[in-house]
Amino acid sequence: DQAVPIYSNLKIGDDCYVGRDCIFDLMGKINIGNKVTISHRAVLNTHTNAGKSPVAHNALTKSIGNIKINDGAYLGSNVTVLESVVIGRNTIIGARSLVNKGIPGDVTAFGVPCKVREDNK
């Protein structure tokens, strides 16, 4: 494992590109493999916190989960990845997609929510 530690909850592998204005929420862990591209304005959210309900006066659901982006993956601009998601090896995620569950390797996926559209093998 050759990843360079930047923060204790963030590992970025070799030969990666991270575009401008990306946001990495590090309440959970983010593990980015080798040769991964994360285009500008991507958001990786390791937690969800709906806050408090003004009507019910109580805290709403909060969840924390890790994100893993495997080797060779490509995330287009303005992609949002939510907690507990794994993106497979050599997978392409189209611009402006909302990735709310795992995406397998060697596919192209996009949309809101993100869905597999094509096999890249």
Predicted regions and their residues:
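Flexible, glycine/small-residue-enriched loop-and-beta-strand segment within the central core
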Residues: 1-12, 17-86, 112-113, 119-121
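Residues that flank catalytic or metal-binding motifs in active/ligand-binding sites
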Residues: 40, 95, 105
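Catalytic-loop signature of eukaryotic-like protein kinases
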Residues: 72, 90, 107
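Beta-rich strand-turn-strand
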Residues: 77-92, 97-101
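Acidic, glycine-centered active-site loop in nucleotide-sugar glycosyltransferases
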Residues: 104-105, 110-113
